[in-house]
């Protein structure tokens, strides 16, 4: 990959000039000037996902210049490098091949001269056999009962993805009851264990190294709870499986290594749901639906790798997002799914985006002098409308938003879905076009008020509009559709990282806090006052010691 400061490119400088000339243009003006704007600035993917980006503060020239930027930083070679297994995770010396995990074409993918696909397919076959055994009831616990509950113990990428996907695809779930434990706060494991029966519970311990502090603390507590009731350490083998690569530690824990499911160092945590980390997904939905999830992502991978930038959905979304982040100085993006099943979707891509592109050092090791990754947040509609949309409509911050919704619901109860979609359609219209002072006054006049009576109220009811949004309407939530949506956002994040000239696949920012926590933990086991830190940290620790006594 080339190391190019984007702000020094011809395209960036042209974008600065273009922005200065167009920053005050109104969406209402752009739509009025071009009746075909929706047709021009929307695209349908596989007759299943409509991406409408017409309500953005862009023109043909804006997109042309943004695409010029993608060419000038040589995005094409970066895409090829990722798919071809080059070690683009430079700081860790690793390839980045979550795409190989869902490579349904079985095209050879080489890492260090070796095709990884035979191993990928072998692990998938092992996952399928395990899932089929558990789901069918063939797998028995220590008292001969079939498994009814599955507890996934992981954190970060070993938790967020499986939680989000199993929730988003709940209409496809089977009889197994899924539980997820991530927080090292003992409350999380304690409350979960209240709801399961050791005779019918399978624990999945998801940690590549089998040393992750939070995960192993929870796993050891779960094992102690289980052995205390089951009465025999040997029974652990029938109730625990590992998603890991540390054979020695897995065996020492008491797990049969035949029930250890491996993945590779070229799988990043936040991209690992396609690997053995996706075991709870396959257990909850059945392996066939897990395969459909992979298929959907693979099809989006193919679209991303082969489609011209002008029609390439992840590239277009990335470029439009960069336009706001780096030129309009927007600090955040909201992801707003109008689908209750997708209630963890924004949280999942909060990690996916902020852990990937929350970097202030470029690929040359220099501090950047431009903005990189945005803050990602969001909640499902319509809940968010009664929480934070006030600021989106009338606040002082520009917040580009992605609105997502299924055309067809899995729960056709009365007129719930038409009401949900009425809000989905209304919000992007309201954000784009607002309500003028004249329109507010006309409403009051129509209600029999005089302008003199309402003059003090009018300013508060004006909506400026010109708030940009993408609308992503899909036919119905299915495993294949969700796979495509996840891959779409993954590739959007990748494209932005390439243009910003940062490494998107490491996460050194999580290390310092962990190191300090490991230093502080022994200090908490002593009653002596702590003086080795700054006055604030010393004061916090010593107050805790006094209060817990």
Curated annotation (Swiss-Prot):
Family affiliation: Belongs to the GPI family.
Major site of localization recorded for this protein: cytoplasm
InterPro entries named in the record: G6P_Isomerase, G6P_Isomerase_C, Phosphoglucose_isomerase_CS, SIS_dom_sf, SIS_PGI_1, SIS_PGI_2
Organism of provenance: Tolumonas auensis (strain DSM 9187 / NBRC 110442 / TA 4)
Active site residues according to the UniProt entry: 355 (proton donor), 386, 514
Record's protein name: Glucose-6-phosphate isomerase
Record's subcellular location: Cytoplasm
Role according to the record: Catalyzes the reversible isomerization of glucose-6-phosphate to fructose-6-phosphate.
PROSITE patterns: P_GLUCOSE_ISOMERASE_1 (PS00765), P_GLUCOSE_ISOMERASE_2 (PS00174), P_GLUCOSE_ISOMERASE_3 (PS51463)
Pfam families associated with the record: PGI
Record keyword Lipoprotein present: no
Top-level taxonomic group: Bacteria
Catalytic activity from the UniProt record: alpha-D-glucose 6-phosphate = beta-D-fructose 6-phosphate
GO CC field: cytosol
EC number, UniProt record: 5.3.1.9
Record's keyword terms, sorted: Cytoplasm, Gluconeogenesis, Glycolysis, Isomerase
GO biological process: gluconeogenesis; glucose 6-phosphate metabolic process; glycolytic process
Listed pathway(s): Carbohydrate biosynthesis; gluconeogenesis; Carbohydrate degradation; glycolysis; D-glyceraldehyde 3-phosphate and glycerone phosphate from D-glucose: step 2/4
GO MF entry, a single one: carbohydrate derivative binding
Group of enzyme by EC: isomerase
């Amino acid at each position: 990959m080339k190391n190019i400061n984007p702000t020094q490119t011809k395209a960036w400088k042209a974008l600065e000039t273009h922005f200065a000339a167009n920053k005050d243009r109104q969406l209402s003006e752009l739509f009025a000037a071009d009746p075909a704007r929706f047709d021009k600035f929307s695209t349908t993917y596989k007759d299943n996902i409509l991406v409408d980006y017409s309500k953005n503060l862009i023109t043909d020239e804006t997109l042309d210049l943004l695409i010029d930027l993608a060419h000038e930083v040589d995005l094409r070679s970066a895409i090829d490098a990722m798919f071809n297994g080059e070690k683009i995770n430079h700081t860790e010396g690793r390839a980045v091949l979550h795409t190989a995990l869902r490579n349904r074409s079985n095209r050879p993918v080489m890492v260090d001269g070796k095709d990884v696909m035979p191993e990928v397919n072998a692990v998938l076959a092992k996952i399928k056999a395990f899932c089929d055994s558990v789901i069918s009831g063939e797998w028995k616990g220590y008292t001969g009962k079939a498994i009814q509950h599955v507890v996934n113990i992981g954190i970060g990428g070993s938790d967020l993805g499986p939680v989000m996907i199993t929730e988003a695809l709940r209409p496809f779930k089977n009889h197994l009851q899924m539980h997820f434990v991530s927080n090292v706060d003992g409350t999380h494991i304690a409350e979960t264990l209240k709801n399961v029966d050791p005779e019918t519970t399978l624990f999945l311990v998801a940690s590549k190294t089998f040393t992750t502090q939070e995960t192993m603390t929870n796993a050891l507590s779960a094992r102690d709870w289980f052995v205390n009731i089951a009465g025999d350490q040997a029974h652990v083998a029938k109730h625990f499986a590992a998603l890991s690569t540390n054979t020695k530690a897995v065996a020492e824990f008491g797990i049969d290594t035949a029930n250890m499911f491996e993945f590779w160092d070229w799988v990043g945590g936040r991209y690992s749901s396609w690997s053995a980390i996706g075991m709870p997904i396959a257990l909850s939905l059945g392996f066939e639906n897990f395969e459909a999830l992979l298929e959907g992502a693979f099809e989006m991978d193919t679209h991303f790798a082969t489609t011209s930038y002008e029609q390439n959905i992840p590239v277009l979304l990335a470029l439009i997002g960069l336009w706001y982040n780096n030129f309009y100085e927007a600090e955040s993006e909201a992801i707003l799914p109008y689908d209750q099943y997708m209630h963890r979707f924004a949280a999942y891509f909060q990690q996916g985006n902020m852990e990937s592109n929350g970097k202030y050092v470029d690929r040359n090791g220099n501090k950047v002098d431009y903005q990189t990754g945005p803050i990602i947040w969001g909640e499902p509609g319509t809940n968010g409308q009664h929480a934070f949309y006030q600021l989106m409509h009338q606040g002082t911050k520009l917040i580009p938003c992605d609105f997502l919704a299924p055309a067809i619901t899995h729960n056709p109860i009365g007129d719930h879905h038409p009401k949900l979609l009425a809000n989905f359609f209304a919000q992007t219209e309201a954000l784009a076009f607002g309500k003028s002072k004249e329109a507010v006054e006309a409403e009051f006049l129509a209600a029999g008020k005089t302008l003199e009576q309402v003059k003090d109220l009018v300013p508060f009811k004006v909506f400026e509009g010109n708030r940009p949004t993408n609308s992503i309407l899909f036919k119905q939530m299915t495993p294949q559709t969700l796979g495509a949506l996840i891959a779409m956002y993954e590739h959007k994040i990748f494209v932005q990282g390439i243009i910003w000239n940062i490494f998107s696949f490491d996460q050194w920012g999580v290390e310092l806090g962990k190191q300090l926590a490991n230093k502080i933990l022994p200090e908490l086991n002593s009653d002596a006052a702590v003086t080795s830190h700054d006055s604030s940290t010393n004061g916090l620790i010593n107050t805790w010691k006094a209060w817990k006594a």
